[in-house]
Amino acid sequence: MGGDKENLDLSDLNASLPAAAAALSAEDRAGLVNALKDKLQSLAGQHTDVLEALSPNVRKRVEYLREIQGQHDEIELKFFEERAALEAKYQKLYEPLYTKRYNIVNGVVEVDGGNDEPASENAAEGKDADAKGVPDFWLTAMKTNEVLSEEIQERDEPALKYLKDIKWARIDDPKGFKLDFFFDTNPFFKNSVLTKTYHMVDEDEPILEKAIGTEIEWYPGKNLTQKILKKKPKKGSKNAKPITKTEVCESFFNFFSPPQVPDDDEDIDEDTADELQGQMEHDYDIGTTIRDKIIPHAVSWFTGEAVQAEDFDDMEDDEEDDEDDDEDEEEEEEDEDEDEDDEEEKSKPKKKSAGKPKLPSKGGAQGGADQPADCKQQ
């Protein structure tokens, strides 16, 4: 067994990972792999120590359980493959609908009767009467979402008004997915498409390896992710020119400059690894929100209907939690009442009994149970 321990590497953990991967899939969360190699190797050593501590008979049973787990993982692998094929099939069915949406949003085509329909009494006169398509469609849709609204700063909005479409697609080499943001010609940057790509460790395990974003070609003085501070020189200073300092500030466009994992994980201490993992999870949360919520249901976010639907779901979850809390409180009250009854019985003077002793009450006493700076318009 000692030799096995020395030869154990990360690949020996694969048999124990699918269950964790499934949990991550349910919550749609991402893990930071490179920074956790040391922890995984430590777990590998613990895994070997556990087996060594078992008696031969128990160890044999555990090994058989691991064989059963391997059979389970093979079935799970087929599930992942079939799910990917099913998603690809329906993605093709969605595409024509997304094309129609693009054409309407950007004024490429007009909806039948769109120019003839009388305006409602609540419609703002002349505000968008001459506008093509649906102005600020994607900006409004994203701002309505709670996760994305925290990322979009006021100074980002003029640039995001030029956003024409958002698409996503799976990638195969390496496995993962990408988001494409299509922009009209604008005064902020040269790029017509900004892309964010997520590389996954394995095609079947939603564990994030790294994220890559397009380098934005900002026009001079238009970089929304930076603010320029000018400080006047001190009186009597030989340098009469103002001191200029550039600082990174909060902006939605920081999404295209994701946190990077160092190639050598030995350079990362535990606190830095935890901070980096939090940043990557947040970045992945933004990406999957756009992929899974905004793109497929954009008009519902534009109108606010999606928020109402999410609020309704949250209310149902809260009601279930409240019911569980009420049940717990009732059980605690019953336990307290039973404890009080027991105390009263104990405090009463005992009488001699010629018969059998009374059994204790069935309800006996129970045991108790660094952020970037805010940017102002340059």
UniProtKB/Swiss-Prot annotation:
Residues covered by region (Disordered): 306-378
Motif Nuclear localization signal per record, residues: 230-235, 348-352
Chain location of the short sequence motif Nuclear export signal per the record: 54-69
Positions bearing Cysteine methyl ester: 375
UniProt key word Ion transport: no
Chain intervals with Low complexity compositional bias: 356-378
Coiled-coil parts of chain: 33-87
Domain of life according to the entry: Eukaryota
Pro-peptide positions on chain: 376-378
Biased composition (Acidic residues): 308-344
A single MF term (Gene Ontology): chromatin binding
A cellular-component GO term for this protein: cytoplasm
GO biological process, alphabetically ordered: double-strand break repair via homologous recombination; nucleosome assembly
Record's keyword terms, sorted: Chaperone, Coiled coil, Cytoplasm, Lipoprotein, Methylation, Nucleus, Prenylation
Compartment list: Nucleus; Cytoplasm
Signal peptide per UniProt: none
Name of the protein: Nucleosome assembly protein 1;1
